[in-house]
Design a protein with these regions (language model features):
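Short pre-functional
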Residues: 1-10, 33, 112-113
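Active-site-proximal segment of tyrosine recombinases
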Residues: 11-13, 100-101, 111, 119-130, ...
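Conserved tyrosine-mediated DNA breakage-rejoining catalytic core shared by Y-recombinases
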Residues: 14-51
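Catalytic phosphate/metal-binding cores of nucleic-acid and nucleotide-processing enzymes, i.e., regions
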Residues: 15, 41, 75-76, 96-97, ...
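Catalytic-site neighborhood detector that most strongly recognizes the C-terminal catalytic loop/helix
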Residues: 34-36, 128-153
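Active-site/catalytic core of tyrosine-dependent DNA strand-transfer enzymes
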Residues: 48-98
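Residue-level marker of regulatory loop/turn positions in helix-turn-helix DNA-binding domains and
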Residues: 80, 103-104
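Active-site His/Glu-centered metal-binding helix of metallohydrolases
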Residues: 106, 110
Length: 156
């Protein structure tokens, strides 16, 4: 969910089933409406097939006010940020991902791969709800080698 929505971990952990599942219509929602904790800005996010598949795998008649990522000790509470970090780190190790991986890596990875697939940075700025283009550029993590590739491939 975090990887395919580009949400900050605090917003991911605060998600409840009512946010992703329409209990009246008995189906998953097409969009997620989030008021971002950090900025207070509202963001509407389309739930792609990867997210919907994961949600369908996990949904088992949970109550509307249950958290998607609930604490095993306190079911009426989400897991902690530190527990989320441990889960992400373990998943990175198990899949052979090296380097400094954190929960925020999920958000940044979405943008990087979107950018590599041709999504303009201005659109990513809107998706991220960033206040400046500079922040978005930093998220994309463009390295010198990638800048060099532009010069090698654009020959007028």
């Amino acid at each position: 969910v975090g990887l395919n929505t580009a949400l900050r971990i605090g917003d991911v952990l605060s998600l409840q089933w009512k946010d992703v599942y329409d209990y009246k219509r008995r189906r998953f929602r097409a969009h997620l409406q989030v008021v971002e904790q950090k900025t207070g800005k509202t963001n509407q996010i389309a739930l792609n097939d990867c997210v919907l598949h994961a949600l369908r795998q996990c949904y088992n008649g949970q109550k509307a006010d249950e958290y998607l990522f609930y604490s095993a000790c306190h079911k009426n509470q989400p897991i902690s940020r530190s527990q989320a970090w441990r889960i992400v780190r373990q998943a990175a190790e198990e899949t052979g991902v090296d380097g400094n991986v954190s929960c925020h890596s999920l958000r940044k990875t979405f943008g990087y791969h979107a950018w590599k697939q041709g999504v303009p940075p201005a659109m990513l700025m809107m998706i991220y709800n960033h206040s400046s283009y500079q922040i978005t550029k930093r998220y994309l993590g463009i390295i010198q080698e990638e800048k060099d590739d532009v010069f090698y491939h654009v020959q007028l």
